[in-house]
Amino acid sequence: MVEERGTIYLYTGEGGGKTTNALGLALRCLGHGYKVVIIQFLKWWKNTGEYKFKKILPENYEIYQFGRKGWKGLKNLTDKDRELCRKALNMAKKKAKERPKLLVLDEINLALDCKLLDIGEVIDFLKTVPKETNVILTGRRAPQELIQFADFVNEVIDIKHPDEIPTVEGIQY
């Protein structure tokens, strides 16, 4: 029996490109005239291409960031990070009710791995997503429960990733 909820896509793994994969699908949806909502957990930097893009196409593209300014690692997580992740999840619940074609929950897997969110609450929310809405979950170290729940799961690995080559504006961010 097919569930009456949106389709869940999960991108995880230690390789780069999980957010980039999600953004590619977002671009595809936008090209067809559909609405896209991106909620970024643990991210705050506004100098990324995906964040700047909202100025170009404001009517069908929404992006929200819920990260502590200056945050750069998992070693110094605080209650503020937990609070911001809760706000991000609440925003996702609100936006899902608007039935966008695509809802991207960027880095939610990492937020779950860091225990900033409750896995049961996230899965309960995903069960309520309207069937018209496709959801993409990104981030390293996706919990096994989420992997089992998702409809499609992709693991991203780096075959080759030279550290001496710097990141490039417009490519990696």
Stretches with model-predicted labels:
Residues 41, 107-108:
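Generic detector of well-ordered alpha-helical packing
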Residues 58-62, 100, 131-133:
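A short helix-to-beta-strand connector/capping loop
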Residues 2, 6-95:
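Conserved P-loop
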Residues 104:
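Glycine-rich phosphate-binding loops of nucleotide-dependent enzymes
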